[in-house]
Design a protein with these regions (language model features):
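Alpha-helical membrane-interface segments at transmembrane helix boundaries
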Residues: 38-53, 81-92, 185, 189, ...
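Non-cytoplasmic
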Residues: 97-102, 106, 110, 138, ...
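Generic hydrophobic transmembrane alpha-helix motif, especially the helices
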Residues: 30, 34, 51, 57, ...
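Transmembrane helix boundary and interhelical loop/hinge segments in multi-pass membrane proteins
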Residues: 156-165
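Transmembrane alpha-helices
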Residues: 49-65, 158, 177-209
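Gly/Trp-centered helix-boundary motif
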Residues: 1-63, 67, 203, 216, ...
Length: 238
């Protein structure tokens, strides 16, 4: 499902209620169907794929921004570090769910216009298929969710920059960028991998929560959050 396998016997949005009412035999619905006759198992597969795409993309965004920001802050120290960490403190104080709601609401019309004006462009086709609200989510992740990664990388850089091999690299005339790229970040790989992996379920939960509220992935596409919302409606009905 996460890789977009398309071996299912029918589409995720095909309505089959009329065929069932006419007595036609259809492929067995293992999880049953929703009120529109759409197969729940297939929609669950697509929902998992959408959630995994969002989780992995958010983790990559957090990885790039957090590692870059944290390494610069930790390496240069002094006033640079103080200013950059106060920015992190401000971002930490922001209510992330509210910011995501505002960004998703504000970006929706602009993304729709972008899709209309750039037909055929791969990003336009992606957001046309996956829904315009995803752009707002990705922007929110880029603005808010990298701060934890940056703090972890900064702390590791503060320790590593005192090592002898960093002093030797400076003595040989290596630039700050080269020292960070070739000597410091590779030695933070353990922390980077662990933090990135922890970011994936956090992003999936955030997307599911937003879709549950109705401001995430839009119909006819589905996600785990929107499916939970539909299921809650069914539980309340019956």
């Amino acid at each position: 499902a996460a890789l977009g396998i398309r071996s299912h016997p029918f589409g995720y949005s095909n309505e089959e209620l009329q065929r069932i009412a006419d007595g036609e035999k259809v492929f067995p619905h293992v999880f049953g169907t929703d009120r529109y006759g759409r197969d729940i198992m297939v929609r669950t597969m697509f929902a998992t794929r959408v959630s995994m795409i969002i989780g992995l993309t958010a983790a990559l965004i957090v990885l790039v921004i957090g590692a870059l920001y944290g390494s610069i802050s930790g390496f240069f120290g002094g006033t640079v570090d103080v200013v950059m960490q106060r920015i992190v403190d401000v971002i930490y104080s922001l209510p992330d769910v509210l910011i995501i709601l505002l960004i998703a609401t504000a970006m929706g019309p602009h993304v729709t216009q972008f899709i209309t004006d750039h037909q055929g462009f791969f990003l336009a086709e992606f957001f046309k298929k996956e829904g315009p609200n995803l752009m707002g989510m990705f922007i929110a992740f880029a603005c808010l969710y990298w701060v934890g990664m940056s703090r972890i990388i900064r702390g590791q850089i503060l320790t590593l920059k005192k090592q002898e091999y960093v002093t030797a690299a400076r003595a040989l005339g290596a630039s700050s960028g080269r020292i960070i790229k070739r000597h410091l970040l590779p030695n933070c790989i353990g922390q980077i991998v662990a933090t990135t992996c922890l970011q994936i379920p956090s992003a999936i939960f955030t997307e599911s929560f937003m879709s549950f509220l109705g401001v995430g992935v839009l119909a006819p596409l589905t996600s785990l959050g929107s499916m939970c919302s539909d299921a809650l409606g069914g539980i309340s009905t019956y």
